[in-house]
Amino acid sequence: MSGLFSLESWSTVWTHRESFLLGLGNTLQTAVCALALAFIIGAALGLMSTSGSKLLRIIARIYVEFVQNTPLLLQLCFLYYALAFAGVSLGVFRTGIIALGVYTGAYMGEVVRAAIESVPKGQFEAAQAQGFNYLQRMGYIILPQSIPVMLPPMVNQVVNLFKNTSCLYIVGGADLISVTYSFVTGASTGGAYAPAYIVCGLIFFVVCFPLSTLAARWEASLKERKGRVNPGLKTAAKKVELKEAA
């Protein structure tokens, strides 16, 4: 081709646009499934990290530290290649879901933990004084206040997860990055490097930028309301006052 940014290169990318859309579809499918797994792991880790059991807190801490301090690529390669040598073949799609879910779940667990710990300790004590069990304390007092706090950083983790799907390229996935690489190295399409990677980058940007903006505005809105009296605190305090009066 006559140049990296030639009209012929852009025309080639446009002609094969369905390949990029297919890659985007595979990326979204992997991201959604991995996100569901990450939510489950994150919620479990967050609750374990704030539980009264020292053993559960230690297990959660070990998991988080190990996953966060080892590269995602290494975890992905281990699941795909090391297990294959052991006779366990998960396939690219399932490997991607598990690796991304396990990795992102560690970060979501920290988000859940921080959100729960942001609730004043006095509200735990007020709920205990009313005879609430653990599930009641979490359901009526703690989670209603911590969920709005954890949502903005959760959205940021969703963005990170979507971008991390690019790591599937290392195991030959059919994600957007893999499709782009196959395109630029193809016998009939090779040479359109710049247009192909620009289109790939724009697709990532179109998906990630609105989510990042939403998270930033959401967080700013929460900070503006930070000084207001928390309804959960007022409810718990009122119940304590009624019990003492009785």
What are the residue ranges of the model-derived segments?
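Transmembrane alpha-helices and adjacent helix-loop boundaries
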Residues: 1-246
